[in-house]
Swiss-Prot record:
It comes from the Bacteria. This is Trans-2,3-dihydro-3-hydroxyanthranilate isomerase. It comes from Pseudomonas fluorescens. GO terms for biological process: phenazine biosynthetic process. The keyword Isomerase applies. It is an enzyme of class 5 (isomerase). Pathway: Antibiotic biosynthesis; phenazine biosynthesis. The gene is phzF.
């Protein structure tokens, strides 16, 4: 038997944000079993908490319904908030396949209500399949260069001219499935406030409510293309079109040639608890 909790990440009230199922004491579960459990839960991600291997507080494995991820934003933020309920520490170190991720926890009346994470610094390059992607999205152009960022998962960014245009998107998901091992992030906005939608048949997600691993790269993308200054925090609202509004905050410090830190933060709230009988 294994206990789990469902955290709605990047939300301050239940039934908003992006849910993640966090399974505790999972050292006895083989990876194939973790994958089957994640498929049974059928959330965008489930995480499994194991004993640490490299001096952190816990080792975390992350599974979508179809594959394991080396790093993901909302599942780790939700996991940190879930683990924070079992410790008085204000800082947690969670081991992942992309290294150890540091978290700062924010508490209110004794409960963890938010967390911030230092994300892996990504690499990026031009996508090189612009026409094919634009056709799959049903649009004619991107307001910024179409580039792909890699920080564990791979995120492609496509700019839309307005929030109305972003909300009106109806992509061809079958065509998007030809973009293997990547998520397509479409965004619009100005200044410090931006809206985003993420589509990724490759990761088993038709549309994601909150993509924390893309929030940091989006802040970098905006700074690189002159929309904000490096070090300036941005607010990213996602999930509106699917009824799961999710609010993320991101900041990229340094400069394009030498990034020093990528920070993503947000709230999280417990939706439910349960036990699986295996």
């Amino acid at each position: 038997m294994h206990n789990y909790v469902i955290i709605d990440a990047f939300a301050s009230v239940p039934l908003e944000g992006n849910p993640v199922a966090v399974f505790f004491d999972a050292d006895d579960l083989p990876p194939a079993q973790m994958q089957r459990i994640a498929r049974e839960m059928n959330l965008s991600e489930s995480t499994f908490v194991l004993k640490p291997r490299n001096g952190g507080d816990a080792l975390i494995r992350i599974f979508t319904p179809v594959n394991e991820l080396p790093f993901a934003g909302h599942p780790l933020l939700g996991t940190a908030i879930a683990l924070g309920a079992h410790t008085d520490n204000h800082r947690l170190y969670l081991e992942t396949q992309m290294g150890t991720i540091a978290f700062e926890l924010e508490r209110q009346n004794g409960s963890v209500i938010a967390a911030s994470m230092d994300q892996p610094i990504p690499t990026w390059t031009a996508l090189g399949r612009d026409a094919e992607l634009l056709k799959a999205l049903g649009i004619s152009d991107s307001t910024f260069p179409i580039e792909i960022y890699h920080n564990g998962p791979r995120h492609v960014f496509v700019g839309l001219p307005s929030i109305d245009a972003l909300s009106a998107l109806h992509p061809d998901h079958r065509a998007l499935s030809n973009f293997h091992d990547m998520a397509i992030n479409c965004f619009a906005g100005a200044g410090r406030r931006w809206r985003s939608r993420m589509f990724s048949p490759a990761y088993g997600v038709v549309e994601d409510a909150a993509t924390g691993s893309a929030a940091g790269p989006l802040a970098i993308h905006l700074a690189r293309h002159g929309q904000i200054e490096f070090g300036q925090p941005v607010e990213i609202l996602q999930g509106v079109e699917i009824g799961r509004p999710s609010l993320m905050f991101a900041k990229a410090e340094g400069r394009a040639e030498q990034l020093t830190r990528v920070e993503v933060s947000g709230n999280g709230v417990t939706f439910g608890r349960g036990t699986i009988v295996l």
